[in-house]
Amino acid sequence: MKRQFVHTEDGSTTLYVPALNEHYHSIHGAIQESLHIFIRAGIEFYLQTHSTGFPLSELNILEAGFGTGLNAYLSLLYAEKQKIRLQYHSLEKYPLTFEEIQQLNYKTQIPAKNPDLFDRLHTSPWETENLISPFFRLDK
């Protein structure tokens, strides 16, 4: 499948698929979109509304479409910061090539103690559970 790189308004990259006339993330900001929708309105909202007097320490996530790995990367960084164990399941029909992954600029756009974790998400084997960090397991 042919994909083109697009720089979004927040400076991050995303992909565009001409055959589908579809972007992987918002052209107004890939990182901003993922932070707002996946982290704040997703994970944080769930943790705030499903706590029963005790903070949740573990969460399972299913993502349909691993894509650029941005949602998984932000979730991983969130889990590390909040010390919450995430079991992350992701499906992907058209995985990115190594060359495409290297052209994404998330490691330079998102401050992280260990930006190499982004590469681990992408280089971990498919169809198996992968321990990416003590707080993040990936099954893709």
Where are these predicted regions, by residue range?
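Glycine-rich SAM-binding Motif I of class I
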Residues: G69-Y73
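S-adenosyl-L-methionine
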Residues: E100-K140
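Rossmann-like AdoMet
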Residues: M1-L59, L76-I110, F136
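Conserved beta-strand/loop positions that form the S-adenosyl-L-methionine
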Residues: L62-A64
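Aromatic-residue hotspot detector
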Residues: F38, F66, L91, F118-D119
